Amino acid sequence: MTDPIADMLTRLRNAVSAKLTRVDIPASRLKADIARILQDEGYIQGFKLLDDAGQPAAPVKTLRVFLKYGPHGERIITGIERISRPGRRVYFGRDDVPDVLAGLGTSILTTSRGVMTGREAAKVGVGGEVLCNIW
């Protein structure tokens, strides 16, 4: 797999389209940071890091994401878009961090201070690589 972040986003997109309650994704620290941001922003209910047997453990292999839906079953995540790819990296300076849908969505950046949303990066005054947009 050449782009594990795109794989994570595709699994989330497909799971939401299929109205699943959870989705299992191969784990990494970057993916866990992205899941933390999605939880903090209210796009998912939560996530757990699991070993191969499905139990919480030290050698993490799987990231289990619990999806969130509205009171009538409507999607909370309506769109996910990968921005920076391995073949074409996209960076923004601290003054150029983009808004997603005029502030209705969230951009996720990796910066020198860690993974954060576009709003947090603009507030702190750092730029970075834009991983994805979600709305």
Feature annotation, model-predicted:
Residues 1-135:
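Core subunits and conserved enzymes of cellular information-processing
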